[in-house]
Amino acid sequence: MKALLLLLLASGSAMAHELTPTYPKLTPSYIPGVMSTHVVLWNARQDISYYKVDVFDANMNPVSFIATGGNLKKVDYLGRAHIEVFVREEDQDKATFICTESKLKRGAAQKSLVASKVCSKIK
């Protein structure tokens, strides 16, 4: 039984989502005192449609930010979302990672019980 379960887990798809570029760079935005960068989220998971965007420091503590359209994104299967991330100039040295995390629908029957988290490191 254990061998069968291990075989099923090993043969399953390891598809997640993708966040590019891998190393985004913060540049001055059109808003004074604010830095911005552009990332693209690609959804490779058929069972997931929603992703949460976050910005963290080197210790994975949250950093204040704003993303275009809010921090929860709906991305269809094999679709892309272009996201502009804005960070205060005073927080640019703290901001280390831009991360996206797949969100499972609450109360719905899910094929997947696994949430994926992908981060890009800010240069």
Segments and roles (model prediction):
Residues 89-123:
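Terminal connector regions
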Residues 31-38, 93-97:
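Short, solvent-exposed loop/turn segments enriched in Ser/Thr/Gly
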Residues 41-45, 87-89:
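Non-cytosolic beta-sheet module surface loops
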Residues 1-7:
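Sec-dependent signal peptide recognition
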